[in-house]
Amino acid sequence: QFIYETGDAAGQNMTTTCTWQACKWIMKAVRRFEGLRIKNFLIESNLSNDKKVTYQTFLKGRGIRVMAECLLTAESCEKILKVTPKLLVTAYQSFVMGSISAGMIGININVANIIGSMFTALGQDIACVHESSLAQLHIELTEDNCAYCTITLPSLVIGTVGGGTNLPQQRECLEMLGCAGPNNAHKLAEVIAGFCLALDISTLSAIAADHFARAHEKLGRNRPVNYLKMGDLDNNFFNLACHSLHPDA
């Protein structure tokens, strides 16, 4: 098995070329051994797990392995997510049972939504969304009634140099995040992991509070409603919004 460090590039093309050259050298080198011949050679046979979800990828990783975590207080859960920490953990446990019953590799709510959208905007390889969406979400109740949430992405195939990162709009999006160019791949991984954790918590909370289907039914594309217009964004709108979040301010 060939293992590479590709710096801030996703490095899929460079690793293919390097492996190919190494294998050609090996095939040439073994000719000097009498009776030893390589009958067949393929540059790829799926053992790399390229663009596939596998247990090997889950355990050993491909690309960058990154973890994000947060601690949600009871006040934050009830005020923002509209659930208690206990209800959030109970809902998560139901997802664990469902994931095991379905034979899933890893447990997450909807990481693919973040991976797909951010890969498109940031010039990443869209074909790698499948393996990069592999994730392990964990939520537990702490002794002081907080929800400790963590997510691990073991196979985030991303880069901040090369490939689609040089496209004008994608480059601009990377610059907005402060992740364009060399020495930024791990920073980008942290940003993506943070968004994945945030969306999983938000979606799980909506499901736990029975808001998920209701919101889709009310605001879905089949029922477009102009609830908010540009003209509504006046001082009064923002004053009311700020007051709802900070009533004592």
List the predicted regions and their residue ranges:
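Ligand-binding grooves and catalytic loops that recognize ribose/phosphate and carbohydrate rings
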Residues: 115, 248-249
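Glycine-rich anion/phosphate-binding loop at the beta-strand->alpha-helix junction
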Residues: 4-166
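Internal helix-turn-beta structural module
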Residues: 148-248
